[in-house]
Structures are given as structure tokens and as C-alpha cells.
Amino acid sequence: MNKVPLTEKGAQQLREELQELKTVVRPKVVTAIAEARAHGDLKENAEYHAAREEQGFVEGRIRDLEHQLAHAQIIDVSKLQKDGRVVFGVTVDLVNIETDEEASYQIVGDLEANIKENKISINSPIARALIGKREGDEIQVQAPSGIILYEIAAIGYQ
């Protein structure tokens, strides 16, 4: 199985979610099942069936998180060699050459990607175009509206 890149911060978030599911959510679901079971006939007990369904979702998510963490290659961004190149985990400030619009993205693994937080997947077209480039370099990104040209304004290793 291939290792999936994950920043230290992303791995910590997954660990926290896993801990929450195991120590808080799972016991609540077990209690809900026990309470619903106490109501009697299980065939027509909607509370029981809902609690069992929730238990299935929780257990599935726990398995997913454990699998993701077991197959993660955790990369501490602060320990990366700061040689001025764009690599996994860095934050890149870009300037659209045509519009002078600025954007900032952190390159993260697929599990952490969230455009609302300006985190883009290492497998995204823009990240693939950025990897290995240096500050001041220009890149071309194929977008639905056509090719967009960006200049790398800054690279941050935080």
C-alpha cells in the first residue's frame, strides 16, 4: 500500500477526531442503543434502528481514520530543507500575471485539502505545476477558462 503524505498538523487533526470518536461519540451511541433496547420490541423500535445505524457510521469512520493514519507518511513542514523550492507542505504566494490578483495556498495531502482554508492537494494541477519551482518563477495552470499564468511571489516554510 502506498503511503499518503500528510502534514504533522493534518495528522494531529485526524488523531484528535479519532480520539473524540472513541472516547466520546462511541460511548454515547452505545448508551443510546442500550436505552432504545430497554424500550422493548426491537422490530418496530425506530430509536434502536437509528442508534444502530449511527453506530455503523461511527465504527466506519473510526476504521477509516485508523487506516489513514496507519498509511500516512507524516511530514513535519518545519523540518523541511529551506532551499527556496516549492515542496510538499509549503505555503506559496502567487500573483496572477494578467490580473495582478494574489492568492496563497499551502500544498497538502489529499486528506487535508480544503480550498476554504487555502489548502490544495499535492495532486491538484496547480500544485503539480508548482512543485520544484522557485520564488520568481512563472507557472502555467490549465483551468476550465483556459491557461492561467502565475508568478511565485513567496514561499513559506511554516
UniProtKB/Swiss-Prot annotation:
Asked if the record carries the keyword Hydrolase, the reply is no
Under the heading PROSITE patterns, the entry gives: GREAB_1, GREAB_2
* Keyword Coiled coil appears in the UniProt entry: yes
UniProt GO molecular function = DNA binding; RNA polymerase binding
The UniProt keywords, alphabetically, are: Coiled coil, DNA-binding, Transcription, Transcription regulation
At the top level, the lineage of the source is Bacteria
Alphabetical GO biological process terms:
DNA-templated transcription elongation; regulation of DNA-templated transcription elongation
Q: Which cysteines are joined by disulfide bonds?
A: none
Among Gene3D superfamilies, the record links this protein to:
Transcription elongation factor, GreA/GreB, C-terminal domain (3.10.50.30), Transcription elongation factor, GreA/GreB, N-terminal domain (1.10.287.180)
SUPFAM superfamilies membership: FKBP-like (SSF54534), GreA transcript cleavage protein, N-terminal domain (SSF46557)
Where does the record place a coiled coil? 1-26
Describe the family membership recorded for this protein in Swiss-Prot or TrEMBL: Belongs to the GreA/GreB family.
Q: What role is this protein assigned?
A: Necessary for efficient RNA polymerase transcription elongation past template-encoded arresting sites. The arresting sites in DNA have the property of trapping a certain fraction of elongating RNA polymerases that pass through, resulting in locked ternary complexes. Cleavage of the nascent transcript by cleavage factors such as GreA or GreB allows the resumption of elongation from the new 3'terminus. GreA releases sequences of 2 to 3 nucleotides.
Matching entries from HAMAP family are given as: GreA_GreB
Q: What is this protein called?
A: Transcription elongation factor GreA
Q: Which organism is it from?
A: Nitrosococcus oceani (strain ATCC 19707 / BCRC 17464 / JCM 30415 / NCIMB 11848 / C-107)
Q: Lineage, please?
A: Bacteria, Pseudomonadati, Pseudomonadota, Gammaproteobacteria, Chromatiales
Q: Which gene encodes it?
A: greA
